[in-house]
Amino acid sequence: MEFLPEPQHPPGPPTMDLEEPKGPEVPSEDHPSNTQWALGPRGPDTLSEMELDTSSVRALVQQLEALPSDLGGQFPDGAPCPLHIATGQGLATQENLDAGGLLSAEAGGDNLLGLLRCEASLPAQSVPPDPAQAAPRLLQPPEDPGGDPGWMEGTEPADNRSSSSSPELWLETAPLVTHRDPPVGTQSQETLASCPAVSEVPGPCGQEELMDGVLFGAKYLGSTQLLSERNPPPSTRMGQAQEAMDRVKAPEGETQPMTEVDIFISTKRVKVLAADSQDALMDHALQTISYIADIGPVLVLMARRRLAKRTTSQDRQRQLYKMLCHVFHSEDAQLIAQAIGQAFSIAYSQFLQENRIDPSQVGMQPSASASHPHNGDLDHFCNSQNCREVCIQKRPGEGLGVALVESGWGSLLPTAVIANLLHGGPAERCGALSIGDRVTAINGTSLVGLSLAACQAAVREVRRHSSVTLSIIHCPPVTTAVIHRPHVREQLGFCVENGIICSLLRGSAAERGGVRVGHRIIEVNGQSVVAMPHARIIQLLTETREIHIKTMPAATYRLLTGQEQPVYL
């Protein structure tokens, strides 16, 4: 390396301030960036005293060679060196700089750490930065408006800066990995494992199919509206379904207008879609479906709608609801009704699993309805308020003034039933007896299991007493029996002749439901059959899977209708 000859200095000093700065060596605002700096260990007081001999030049060259190679050039086209920015070299004059020198003893450790991080992230000098790519954004740009704005490529105004914080002191970069919170509805594997599994619900459709939704073809006949309470008894529901069908369905012999539709059933909703365009004609949430009745090929779908708030106290207590009854015709009416019932069961099982409820704790047993069928007599017998002791005061030798009939074969409590009361007699005067009451004992003597003749003889024996105590169970004269069948092909288990039940099959669905021999059928599914032909009664009994029958003893019916004269005891 050649050494340059010693420079010849002018006799006078240059016009510059060479006073040694008390702080860090920072370029002055009045001098350009190419001003020479004293690099020796001790700078001379004046420029005339600085003599560069050969040894000083060699020391200067060694110090230059010791500097990093990447500081030798400027970056006119790209971003400046962060080290130059930190030391104030290589840029235009800055107004405010750090009070502590970066390489001095009192320099902050944070600044040094940030500088090292910036040096590690510098791009190679040979590869110019791509303007299309977003360059790192400097948090402390130079404040000189006249400086070269080329280094600010890739920056954006302060108002558009990202709100995400960066650990770097000098650079703000986008995070490589974004931590996202799990969705609200997600659950961990441990949580799902602790929930009871959804049991398989029997039905005509697969469980996954119903969760996605299944379609059934049908013919839409029409709709009507009914007013109803929120939870009427099943017999009332069946009567409402029969009334809706009678309103919509055309009489026999007349043309029935109908439209081809598809019934969409899922665990969330029940929709009626147009068969050609698949447009939703009706859409009901599953929880609003109140009742489904399949009456032969006719399907009645009943959806509940809450009415506006009533002002009167009577309407407020009743809480009436509007029932939207849709009537369809389909050969698969029974299958559609079963599918809707299966959707209810699956939705209930999902609700239990999501809330981590054990089905055994809420009595969710598949055969609960079969093991405990509805029986009108059983409801009255289980109510302790219906069991009474009635004391009748009368003259000795006077009869009680009651007419008794048998309860019927197959009754849960075989005993005598009060069929009529003598007007003005002792039984009517006491005011505690009514038609339909079961007499279980008289003066402490049980009548349960005795024949009708034995019960009548026991009542005649107390004529000589002035006070008679009867043990009764209060029951209405008309009782309700509910028969459940898995399908309409299963036999009912009883025979009917002229509206009177004449025989009963032991262990059949009719016996479990409360049907009794010797009773007269009054209503079937809410429809009166008193004056109905025998063939029509048989049709009503055989066209549905669930039958609600109201009956009363045939002898009581004949007495109340005047067909027979009562014999008072």
Curated annotation (Swiss-Prot):
Record-given protein name: Amyloid-beta A4 precursor protein-binding family A member 3
Cross-referenced PROSITE patterns: PDZ (PS50106), PID (PS01179)
Skewed-composition ranges (Basic and acidic residues): 19-32
Residue ranges of the TM segments: none
Gene coding for it: Apba3
Localization annotation: Cytoplasm, Perinuclear region
SMART domains, alphabetized: PDZ, PTB
Organism: Rattus norvegicus (Rat)
Molecular functions per Gene Ontology: amyloid-beta binding; enzyme binding; enzyme inhibitor activity
